[in-house]
Amino acid sequence: MKISSFRKGRWLGALALFAVVCWSMADAAVDRIVAVVDDGVILESELVRKVDEIKRSLRASRASLPPDSVLVRQVLERMIVDKIQIQMAEKMGIQVDDDTLRMAVSQIAQRNNLTPDQFRRSLAREGIDYGDFLDQVRSEIAMGRLRASQINNQIKISDREVEHYLEAQGGSGAVADREYRLGHILIATPREASPDEVKKARERADRVVKELKAGLDFKDASIRYSDDPQALEGGDLGWRKLSEIPSHIAEVVGGMKDGEVSDPIRSPGGYHIVKMLAMRGVGEAKLTKTHVRHILIRPNEVLSDEDAKNKLLALKTRIENGDDFAELARGHSDDKGSAIKGGDLGWVKPGALVPPFEEAMNALDENQLSDPVQTQFGWHLIQVLERQESSDTNEVLKNRARDELFKRKVDEETELWLRKIRDEAYVEIRLDETPASPGEDAPAGEDSPETFMR
């Protein structure tokens, strides 16, 4: 009897072990790798989660859903490009601390007229995991800092470019006359496309234009066909001045009517199709000058990035407790040019400082101290002393022209840079079937996933 019980127990144990193994194998089979991207991977569970998120967003905006094979291709491509950028940011030591993350989430909540707690509950009602959301925001901030270091901070606008631009505008306020809201579809070509590849892209673009003019909704066409990063948002570029639009598109947009769809527009990145969604006039703008000072702590071989930030936090506490900003700047700032003046940078115009510094400065009230702000130069503690508005027409136009030329160059260079890093990365797509959402079957008759295998 005892032997029988022992054997029975051993048999049940073996069954239990077999069940665990089978469960693990099934679980591993479900959560398989769908793409290898340089040193990282994208899992099917991540792809399914992102596809579900996009589907919820499209349903909320009442956009029609494309076939799963099309949506999966778009979402996976975006995830691949994001993965490349995140890996680059990690290799460059770009980090997003918890304070920056909390501030970003708070700003997102404010834009939705919610408190942070209300916003968190709202995400839960939408089925969005809060931890996943935080990871996504952290990644977006890191990628933004990466692009700023690789693109924004490398762009310089010369006085001659500003003068030439104003001359082309007739030296008047024409730059401020109108803003345009555009829909955009990109049919991409490889960086060194062959004549045959260019021809096929043009033919594809012509087919898209034909469908649009036959009544296809632009948002649906963007989701289905566009290679642009905004494709899943329906290709809406938002409101832009003519000078903020890449030059190859701006030349066409200026003559378009409301609701009009352009013919394909050639650029180094492929063929662009734009739709004039709306246009509006712009009122008179004024130039805001800011009197600002800062303390810079630059990391080095001895002082780590985190130590530099903590040193600034300690200095901020001392200032809030009554210590003099100027004296601390003279004794601690690594910006020797301004340190001898108590950290004073004088009056600065828009566009004069690197973007992360300027964005933080613009968010401050007069006499308010910033939290530590990271730029390519190190960590900054910033204080705005005073602001002035100028209505000097010539000065306003020059600064507006400089700002708009900068935005145009950023857009053009970002498109090329994203294509470059995508082309140079090692990417192996292992998607041999369209992953359906839990409980969903792929609709019959959809395009085979092989159409987007590469």
UniProtKB/Swiss-Prot annotation:
**Source species:** Methylococcus capsulatus (strain ATCC 33009 / NCIMB 11132 / Bath)
Domain PpiC as annotated: residue spans: 177-278, 287-386
Record field: catalytic activity: [protein]-peptidylproline (omega=180) = [protein]-peptidylproline (omega=0)
For this protein, what is the EC number? Answer: 5.2.1.8
Say what the protein does: Chaperone involved in the correct folding and assembly of outer membrane proteins. Recognizes specific patterns of aromatic residues and the orientation of their side chains, which are found more frequently in integral outer membrane proteins. May act in both early periplasmic and late outer membrane-associated steps of protein maturation.
Q: What is its main location?
A: periplasm
Where is this chain's protein located in or outside the cell?
Periplasm
Q: What is this protein called?
A: Chaperone SurA
Keyword line: Chaperone, Isomerase, Periplasm, Repeat, Rotamase, Signal
GO molecular function ontology, one term from the record: peptidyl-prolyl cis-trans isomerase activity
Q: Where is the signal peptide?
A: 1-28
What gene is behind this protein?
surA
Residues in a coiled coil are none
Q: Which Pfam families match?
A: Rotamase, Rotamase_3, SurA_N
Q: What is known of its domains?
A: The PPIase activity resides only in the second parvulin domain. The N-terminal region and the C-terminal tail are necessary and sufficient for the chaperone activity of SurA. The PPIase activity is dispensable for SurA to function as a chaperone. The N-terminal region and the C-terminal tail are also required for porin recognition.
What are the annotated GO cellular component locations? outer membrane-bounded periplasmic space
Q: What InterPro entries does its record include?
A: OMP_Chaperone_SurA, PPIase_dom_sf, PPIase_PpiC, PPIase_PpiC_CS, PPIase_SurA, SurA_N, Trigger_fact/SurA_dom_sf
Residue segments, region Disordered: 431-454
Q: Name one GO biological process term.
A: protein folding
Q: Where is the composition biased (Acidic residues)?
A: 443-454
